[in-house]
Amino acid sequence: MSNQVIILGLDPGTKITGFGVIRIEGHQYVPVDYGCIRPPSHYKLSERYLVICQGVEQLIDQHQPHAVVVETQYVSKNVQSAMKLGMARGVIMIAAKKRGIPIYEYAPSKAKLAVVGTGRASKYQVQGMVQRLLNLSIPPTPEDAADALALAICHAQMPILKQSQYET
C-alpha cells in the first residue's frame, strides 16, 4: 500500500483554469505539477468548456489523484459571469466524476486562511506562502496556478483527509 496521497486543485475560469498537483509524503507537501489550461480566446464558450474538460481529464489520467479540489463559486453581481464560471466548474466536476475521483469544494477565503493564515490574503501573499510551503525556488505563476495549489494544500490540511481513506 502506498502512503502517498495525490491531490489535484483547480481554480476554474473560462479564460484560464489554474491547476496544481501536490503529493503528501508524511507531513510534507511535494509539488508535482502546476500551470494553467488556456482555451484559445477566439473559441466559442462551448469550445472553451471542451478544452477545459479535456485538460482536466488529461491531468487526472496523468497524475491519478485521490481527490479533486475545486474553488467554490463566489457570489457575483454579474449574472452572466457567474453562469459562465458555474459551467466551467460543472465540466471540471464531470471530468472527475467520470473517472470516479472524489470532488471537494472550498471557498477562496478558506484556501487563503489555510495557506496564509487570513481569509483576506492578497494574491501576492498566497503566491509567497505557496512557494514557501512547497519549497519552490520562485513563486508559482500565474496566480491561477498558485490559487489551485493553495486549494490542494487547503484540502491536505482538512481533518476529513485520513491517509487510510486514500491508500491504494
From Swiss-Prot:
EC number: 3.1.21.10
A GO BP entry: DNA recombination
Catalytic activity: Endonucleolytic cleavage at a junction such as a reciprocal single-stranded crossover between two homologous DNA duplexes (Holliday junction)
Keyword Transmembrane: no
Subcellular location: Cytoplasm
PROSITE patterns to which the protein is assigned, alphabetical: RUVC (PS01321)
Catalytic-site annotation from UniProt: 11, 71, 144
Residues annotated as binding Mg(2+) 2: 71
Cofactor dependence: Mg(2+)
GO molecular-function term, one example from the UniProt record: magnesium ion binding
Keywords recorded for this protein, A-Z: Cytoplasm, DNA damage, DNA recombination, DNA repair, DNA-binding, Endonuclease, Hydrolase, Magnesium, Metal-binding, Nuclease
Protein family membership: Belongs to the RuvC family.
Subunit comment: Homodimer which binds Holliday junction (HJ) DNA. The HJ becomes 2-fold symmetrical on binding to RuvC with unstacked arms; it has a different conformation from HJ DNA in complex with RuvA. In the full resolvosome a probable DNA-RuvA(4)-RuvB(12)-RuvC(2) complex forms which resolves the HJ.
Stored NCBIfam families: PRK00039.2-1, ruvC
Function per UniProt: The RuvA-RuvB-RuvC complex processes Holliday junction (HJ) DNA during genetic recombination and DNA repair. Endonuclease that resolves HJ intermediates. Cleaves cruciform DNA by making single-stranded nicks across the HJ at symmetrical positions within the homologous arms, yielding a 5'-phosphate and a 3'-hydroxyl group; requires a central core of homology in the junction. The consensus cleavage sequence is 5'-(A/T)TT(C/G)-3'. Cleavage occurs on the 3'-side of the TT dinucleotide at the point of strand exchange.
Protein name (Swiss-Prot/TrEMBL): Crossover junction endodeoxyribonuclease RuvC
Originating organism: Protochlamydia amoebophila (strain UWE25)
